C-alpha cells in the first residue's frame, strides 16, 4: 500500500514491487504507461525510481514521452527554477519484449525490398492538465492524455488496469474508446466519485 510518508529508498522499492506485480498480470507484449514527476523537495526521486525498476524488475524503458500541459499554475516564485509545463510519461515493457511490444503505428509505405515504413509519431503529447477541478483529488490528469496514450499502445478490446484509479480518469478514457478496464483505489470517496462519473460517459464511435 502506498503512503505519502515513504522514504526515498522505500518509495523506490514500493515502485519496483509494483512492477514485479505487473509482470505477473501483463499480457505478452503489453506495456505499462507510467506518469511520474518530481518536486523541489526531492528532484532526483523520479530518476532513482525508474532506475530501480530497470535494475530490479523484468522491465525496461521502451519510450520516454513528454506530456506538455495546457497551463502551469501557480506562477513560479523561484529565482532559478523554470516553470514546469511538462511532465514525463514512461512506457515500460518487459526486457525480452523490447523489440516486439505492441504499438499501433500504421504502415505508410513498403520498399521494394519488403521493408515496411511506418508513420512518424513524436514522443510529445499535448493535452490538458485535467478534466476540471476536483476537490478530492488535486493530482488528476486529463482523459484526453489517457486517450492519446491508449490510442498508441492499447490493442482493440484491450483490458486496461489502473492500480491508482483515483477519480476514474483512466476508466473514462477506456469507456469512451470501447476498451475494458479494471481499477484499484483505496479511497472510498474516490471510488464513489469515479462510479458516479462513469455513469455519464458514453462510448464514442471514433477517437478523433
Model-derived features: positions:
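Core catalytic lobe of class I
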Residues: 1-193
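S-adenosyl-L-methionine
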Residues: 195-208
Amino acid at each position: 500500500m502506498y503512503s505519502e510518508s515513504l522514504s526515498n529508498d522505500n518509495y523506490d522499492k514500493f515502485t519496483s514491487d509494483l512492477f514485479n506485480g505487473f509482470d505477473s498480470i501483463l499480457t505478452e507484449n503489453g506495456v505499462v504507461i507510467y506518469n511520474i514527476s518530481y518536486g523541489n523537495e526531492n528532484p532526483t526521486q523520479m530518476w532513482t525510481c525508474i532506475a530501480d525498476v530497470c535494475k530490479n524488475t523484468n522491465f525496461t524503458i521502451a519510450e520516454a514521452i513528454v506530456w506538455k500541459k495546457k497551463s502551469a499554475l501557480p506562477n513560479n516564485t523561484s529565482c532559478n527554477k523554470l516553470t514546469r509545463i511538462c511532465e514525463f510519461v514512461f512506457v515500460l515493457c518487459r526486457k525480452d519484449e523490447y523489440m516486439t511490444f505492441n504499438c499501433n503505428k500504421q504502415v505508410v509505405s513498403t520498399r521494394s525490398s519488403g521493408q515496411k515504413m511506418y508513420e512518424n509519431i513524436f514522443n510529445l503529447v499535448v493535452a490538458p492538465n485535467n478534466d476540471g477541478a476536483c476537490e478530492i483529488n488535486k493530482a488528476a490528469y486529463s482523459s484526453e492524455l489517457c486517450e492519446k496514450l491508449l490510442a498508441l499502445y492499447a490493442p482493440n478490446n484491450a483490458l486496461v488496469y489502473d492500480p491508482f484509479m483515483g477519480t476514474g480518469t483512466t476508466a473514462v478514457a477506456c469507456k469512451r474508446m470501447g476498451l475494458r478496464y479494471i481499477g484499484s483505489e483505496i479511497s472510498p470517496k474516490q471510488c464513489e466519485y469515479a462510479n458516479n462519473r462513469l455513469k455519464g460517459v458514453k462510448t464514442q464511435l471514433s477517437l478523433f
